[in-house]
């Protein structure tokens, strides 16, 4: 797909990976609508991007949003949504575990209602994460959700052809989700990535490059693209 003059919607487009994706799409000449829940973050968007507020768990709001935006060529969701239940499964609060799946429900809502406006040559990209296939102790909830997202994409790809759908799976990425600052932040990432083949945290723009690849390459669908610094092999 030649991205120039194509119309794109990016959920989670005001921060981290989503924001970097918006920036790269704009640079490539796309018309971009960035979706988020915090209007105050609209000022972070690059010139040319439009902000719209929406919660991916609100199905009626999503239907209205897609109807308002009209026909699109590119649909990206990097919205995290929900909580992240952490800890041993045998001790886990099951309400917290279930709440972690809000990310999955958000993604499925976005795809379900976005498909109605997506062109036949269009592309969808969702963001999962390495815990889907590399689950450390205490990551059962995150792994379950990520695995479900990737399985969802493989199944849906068969149903929506010639439209395409893929997942991009980041490793540990330096995003605003981590509240640490300065030396503490550097030490945090250094400790967690020490055994990676590329021993550092990734940058949001590096993940966005993977998303752009999945959009541009018309021969890729129903798969997961890893952007993880070799974490899966470590």
Located regions from the model:
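N-terminal Rossmann NAD(P)H-binding glycine-rich loop of SDR-like oxidoreductase domains
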Residues: 14, 22-23
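Conserved glycine-rich cofactor-binding loop
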Residues: 7, 14-15
């Amino acid at each position: 797909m030649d991205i120039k003059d194509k119309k794109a919607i990016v959920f989670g487009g005001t921060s981290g990976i989503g924001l970097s994706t918006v920036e790269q799409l704009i640079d490539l000449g796309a018309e971009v609508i960035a979706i988020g829940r915090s209007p105050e973050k609209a000022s972070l968007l690059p010139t040319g991007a439009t902000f719209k507020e929406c919660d991916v768990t609100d199905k009626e709001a999503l239907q209205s949003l897609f109807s308002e935006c009209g026909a699109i060529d590119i649909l990206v969701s990097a919205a995290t949504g929900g909580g992240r239940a952490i800890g041993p499964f045998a001790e886990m609060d099951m309400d917290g575990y279930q709440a972690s799946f809000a990310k999955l429900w958000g993604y499925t809502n976005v795809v379900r209602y976005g498909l109605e406006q997506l062109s036949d040559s269009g592309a969808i990209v969702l963001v999962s994460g390495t815990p889907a296939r590399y689950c450390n102790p205490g990551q059962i909830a995150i792994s379950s959700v990520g695995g479900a997202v990737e399985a969802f994409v493989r199944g849906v790809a068969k149903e929506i052809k010639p439209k395409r759908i893929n997942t991009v799976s980041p490793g540990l990425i330096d995003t605003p989700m981590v509240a640490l600052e300065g030396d503490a932040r550097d030490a945090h990432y250094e400790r967690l990535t020490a055994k990676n083949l590329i021993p550092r945290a990734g940058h949001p723009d590096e993940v966005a490059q993977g998303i752009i690849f999945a959009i541009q390459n018309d021969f890729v669908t129903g798969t997961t693209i890893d952007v993880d610094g070799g974490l899966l092999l470590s």
